[in-house]
Every structure is written in structure tokens, then in C-alpha cells.
């Protein structure tokens, strides 16, 4: 991350009109905004879409400061806020499609994104085609006359494939297709979406932006071409967040650089250690050559974070359960991006419902981990003890089969 961007994380969203003489923009809670004169009310109505106090759902100064910060960090023309990442994804898509449209969705998308397309979009008469994340230039073969959106998620959910975003965005724009990206892994700082051809960048700010596993929050930053429509459609669909959550997102931005760098350092050490383990088939960490699309990570990203996965050589759920159940520092839980380490296992059969065209066909269990900010030696020791439990049950099974 450049020095300029590090500084921007400290200064973003701290315009004097939001801070009013203090370091952090205060939390401003409001449903009703009152006006002193008819002229003042009328002026607010005219400017209600331009960060003007008008009605609570349009936002308060706390929201405006956070929105400014996200735009300063990611680029684009404006930022819409949502109560979670899934709401940001679904509302971004809903803002631009209608019955009869077609969406190209990466096959390694976040599971709720797939569910949204398969249930809500299908019911609305919008067709979804899932594509292999490594398709690259061949995405042009899947474009239809009614294709409205190309949706990317890079790296992919669980299996971590890094996409060739600039190439795919260029091809999409040749057909006037909107390019949307789930940029949660890049956190808006390690991947600059608008410099790589993205039109709308979406994040579950729940994760690294907030960084403490205690807030649900989503953001969508749009280019100038699409900002007005995204903003107004989101408003019509009633999307808003509490000022307290916006404040916590804004505060999380201040430590985003130092947290991400430590997450990345820790996770790479753990990934390299895992790559040397005899139980591990391969590691899917974007910074390692064993991860699909590693070359695009090297070209397009400025850093990593704590989330990656690895694949075991075998699938033995009883042994995997023993590995997970005895963890001291790795907790089992959904989401990621907080300061704590997390671990979850996916048996090969579980991918049958999560993939349409890009099933990796693993023979062994895939384990996804989020490496937190603990001492990395403690985390490695925790995993080493887990492998001891795992191997004991594998050996027990082998003996019983003799």
C-alpha cells in the first residue's frame, strides 16, 4: 500500500463540515430533521440526494462522513450504505435489472449471492448463467443480447480463485454490460476496483472495514455513470443503516492498513507452514503459486489479508471434527475479517450445491481459515495439535481396516 493511501485512511471522511472541531465525526442520530423556515425546508428537499440533512433515511452527517471516506478510499462517485453485505449485493443487482434480463455470475460467488439469483432473480424473470472464475477472455462466449450485469468476486468464496478482472471488464464494456465486483477480500485498499474497469464495487463492511466482528454493514461504491440510479433505487427500497454502525465503520477505517498488513504477514507464515505438512494436498492462498489465478493477484493486488483455504489429501469427517473441536485459538464461526482467528471445514460433497460449472472435485476436505492478529507461533502450534488429533483418528481407521 502506498504512503498516500495509508494517509488517506487516516484523513478520509474527516472534512470539517462533518467533524465540527473534533477528531472523529460525532454520532448524529435522527429520524426527523426540523427546519426553521419554509425556504430552508424547500432547499433541503432540492438537495436531499447530496448529503444534506433532510430525513433520517437519507442519512445524517455520520453517514455522510462514512460515505465520503469509502469513496475516497475506493474511488467512484458515491457510496450507498446497507445493513449487511448481502443487502448491498442484492440491492446493487436489483437496482439495474428487470424481467427478461440476463446476469453473468461467477460460479464461486458467496453462497447467499447464489441463493438470491436462484430464488429472487428467477422469480422476477431474470436469468443467471454461472461461469468458471478462470474463464478470462472466453467470457465473451457467454454474453447474450440481454446480458445486463457481469458479476465478479475475486478471490472466489471458499476456493479463492483470483479473476482476471481487467480483461473481463474490458470485454463486458464492449457490450455495454455493467461490471460489479464483490471487493470484500480486497477491502477497498489492496485492490483498486475502478482502476481495473469495475463500475460498482461492493463490500461486506462487516468484515475488514469494521474489523471487530460486532457490526453488520454493507457498502456499494459506484462510478459516476451509475451512481444516481444506484442511490435512488436503494433509497426507494428502504435501505439505511444506523449512525452508530456507520461510526464504527468509519473508526475501523483508521486502523485498516495496520490490521491488514499484520493479517497478511501472519496468514502467509501459516500458509507456508501448511504447505509443508504431509496431510495437506495444496494451499489456496492468493500469494502462493498453488492458488488459481496467483498471477493476477501478483499483477493487480497490493497486498493480502488473513483469509485463505487449504485442501487435505483425504476426506475423513470424524478426523476433521477432531481437528476442529480441540482448537484453542481458532474458533468455529461464519464470516471473517475480525481480529480473531476462525476455522471451518467443507467436505467434498458439500460443493455439489455450491458450484455449477467450477466444481474443483477435491478428494480431500477443504478447510478455510481466517488468520487473526494473535501471535503466529501460537496459531501454528494450535494447528499442529489439531493435526495430531486428526492423524490419531486416521491411524485408528487404518488399523481397523486391516
Annotate the PLM regions:
Residues 1-28:
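Short conserved active-site loop signatures built around small residues
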Residues 118-119, 127-129, 259, 314, ...:
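PLP-dependent enzyme catalytic core of the Aspartate aminotransferase-like
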Residues 37-87, 113-119:
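Conserved N-terminal alpha-helix of the aminotransferase class I/II PLP-enzyme fold
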Residues 238, 326-335, 386-396:
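A common structural junction motif
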Residues 70, 234-322, 326-327:
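Structural motif of enzymes handling amino- and sulfur-group chemistry
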Residues 287, 325-354:
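Conserved PLP cofactor-binding pocket of PLP-dependent enzymes
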Residues 149, 178, 200, 282, ...:
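Structural preference for beta-strand elements that scaffold enzyme active sites
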Residues 9-18, 79-277, 397:
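Conserved PLP-enzyme active-site core in the AAT-like
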